């Protein structure tokens, strides 16, 4: 069975490797163009391109697929049975969705219809959801509105960051899409069900500004945001005129004026919130590396009563 693969980041690269390891023929891999990255802004290939080249696969990097006759013709020439799409980052117009014999399967990191859109992992943690998961979806022209082929659940742990949930769902998604491709190969079809009309939510793209901590919110809400925005865009506060990223914290039953530093020691930096307080245990000063509060407190202190 011929499988076109379209994806860009690590989440997608894991699925590509799994599909290849399962023995499916992959005549074409699509990924986004190389982009400048890092402090040196060096042109860097996306993880899917790196994985494809290691696997000896053909890689193409069109800037867009909409109104791109050359790309459309390229896809048609492959005569693929199905396309697997994972965090590709480009819109697939209907004429592209129609090319593969069995359409396009998307690996989506939420339990649809909850958290359609760009940042489902982060929004699930931020909202305090007890669980999330992966859906393999038959793509249509809407935003994550297609019929669901399979659903795979993951219980969000109280300390899970977005990065940790991402890594768990990456493995789940890779295994899930392989299983569905194997079913398609053996039975010639997939049993997809329509998404419920109730319970639809949208996972808006993250912004640096919303990651700024508002100490008037409850400690529980802020703690979830810290985990949801870890590693990027990273929850932050302004300290000495510069942004300081907060990487890990826990809720403690202390009271004070919102934003007031209640204590600063090797045990933690405790800051009052609208309800209860946060004990910060890991942070990242502007221009510096991530560090434990023990390392931070060894070289400096934040005076009790300081308002962040």
Swiss-Prot record:
It catalyses: L-methionyl-tRNA(fMet) + (6R)-10-formyltetrahydrofolate = N-formyl-L-methionyl-tRNA(fMet) + (6S)-5,6,7,8-tetrahydrofolate + H(+). GO terms for molecular function: methionyl-tRNA formyltransferase activity. Pfam families: Formyl_trans_C (PF02911), Formyl_trans_N (PF00551). CDD domains: FMT_core_Met-tRNA-FMT_N, Met_tRNA_FMT_C. Keywords: Protein biosynthesis, Transferase. (6S)-5,6,7,8-tetrahydrofolate binds at residues 110-113. Its EC number is 2.1.2.9. It comes from the Bacteria. InterPro entries: Fmt, Formyl_trans_C, Formyl_transf_N, Formyl_transf_N_sf, Formyl_transferase-like_C_sf, GART_AS, Met-tRNA-FMT_C, Met-tRNA-FMT_N. Transmembrane segments: none annotated. SUPFAM superfamilies: FMT C-terminal domain-like, Formyltransferase. Attaches a formyl group to the free amino group of methionyl-tRNA(fMet). The formyl group appears to play a dual role in the initiator identity of N-formylmethionyl-tRNA by promoting its recognition by IF2 and preventing the misappropriation of this tRNA by the elongation apparatus. PANTHER family: METHIONYL-TRNA FORMYLTRANSFERASE, METHIONYL-TRNA FORMYLTRANSFERASE, MITOCHONDRIAL. This is Methionyl-tRNA formyltransferase. It comes from Neisseria meningitidis serogroup C (strain 053442). The lineage of its organism: Bacteria, Pseudomonadati, Pseudomonadota, Betaproteobacteria, Neisseriales. The gene is fmt.
């Amino acid at each position: 069975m011929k499988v076109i693969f379209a994806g860009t980041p690590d989440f997608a690269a894991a699925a590509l490797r799994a599909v290849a390891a399962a023995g499916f023929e992959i005549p074409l891999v699509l990924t986004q163009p190389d982009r400048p990255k890092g402090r040196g802004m060096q042109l860097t290939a996306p993880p899917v391109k790196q994985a494809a080249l290691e696997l000896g696969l053909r890689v193409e990097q069109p800037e867009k697929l909409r109104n791109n006759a050359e790309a459309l013709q390229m896809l048609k020439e492959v005569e693929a049975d199905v396309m697997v799409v994972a965090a590709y980052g480009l819109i697939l117009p209907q004429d592209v969705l129609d090319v593969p014999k069995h359409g396009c399967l998307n690996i989506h990191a939420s339990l649809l219809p909850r958290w359609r859109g760009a940042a489902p992992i982060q929004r699930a943690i931020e909202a305090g959801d007890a669980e999330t998961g992966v859906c393999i979806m038959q793509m249509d022209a809407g935003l994550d509105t297609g019929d669901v082929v399979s659903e795979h659940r993951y219980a969000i742990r109280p300390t899970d960051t977005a990065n940790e949930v991402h890594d768990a769902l990456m493995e789940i998604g890779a295994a899930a899409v392989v299983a569905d491709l194997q079913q398609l190969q053996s039975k010639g079809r997939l049993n997809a069900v329509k998404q419920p009309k109730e319970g639809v939510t949208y996972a808006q793209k993250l912004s640096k500004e919303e990651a700024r901590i508002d100490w008037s919110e409850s400690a529980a809400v802020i703690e979830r945001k810290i985990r949801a925005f870890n590693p990027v865009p990273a929850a932050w506060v302004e300290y000495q005129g510069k942004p300081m990223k907060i990487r890990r914290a826990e809720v403690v039953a202390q009271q004070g004026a919102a934003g007031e530093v209640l204590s600063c020691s090797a045990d933690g930096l405790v800051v009052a919130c609208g309800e209860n307080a946060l004990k910060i245990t890991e942070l990242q000063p502007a221009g510096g590396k991530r560090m434990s509060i023990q390392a931070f407190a060894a070289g400096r202190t934040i005076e009790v009563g300081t308002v962040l």
